[in-house]
Amino acid sequence: MESVAYILVLTMALAVLFFAIAFREPPRIEK
């Protein structure tokens, strides 16, 4: 079950990175 924990940590890291970029730059999500 260590792969599940690894995937969870990786997802959390990606979410933190995404939110950091999204809140640092002006919102350009919609196309």
UniProtKB/Swiss-Prot annotation:
The chain crosses the membrane at residues 3-23. GO terms for biological process: photosynthesis. Keywords: Formylation, Membrane, Photosynthesis, Photosystem II, Thylakoid, Transmembrane, Transmembrane helix. The keyword Transmembrane applies. The modification N-formylmethionine is found at residue 1. It holds the Pfam family PsbT. Disruption phenotype: Decreased photoautotrophic growth. Decreased assembly of PSII monomers and dimers, increased levels of the CP43-less intermediate, plus an altered dimeric form. Double psbM-psbT mutants do not assemble PSII dimers. Cells are light sensitive and rapidly photoinactivated; recovery requires protein synthesis and light. It is found in: Cellular thylakoid membrane. It is a single-pass membrane protein. GO terms for cellular component: photosystem II reaction center; plasma membrane-derived thylakoid membrane; plasma membrane-derived thylakoid photosystem II. Belongs to the PsbT family. Found at the monomer-monomer interface of the photosystem II (PS II) dimer, plays a role in assembly and dimerization of PSII. PSII is a light-driven water plastoquinone oxidoreductase, using light energy to abstract electrons from H(2)O, generating a proton gradient subsequently used for ATP formation. PSII is composed of 1 copy each of membrane proteins PsbA, PsbB, PsbC, PsbD, PsbE, PsbF, PsbH, PsbI, PsbJ, PsbK, PsbL, PsbM, PsbT, PsbX, PsbY, PsbZ, Psb30/Ycf12, peripheral proteins PsbO, CyanoQ (PsbQ), PsbU, PsbV and a large number of cofactors. It forms dimeric complexes. This is Photosystem II reaction center protein T.
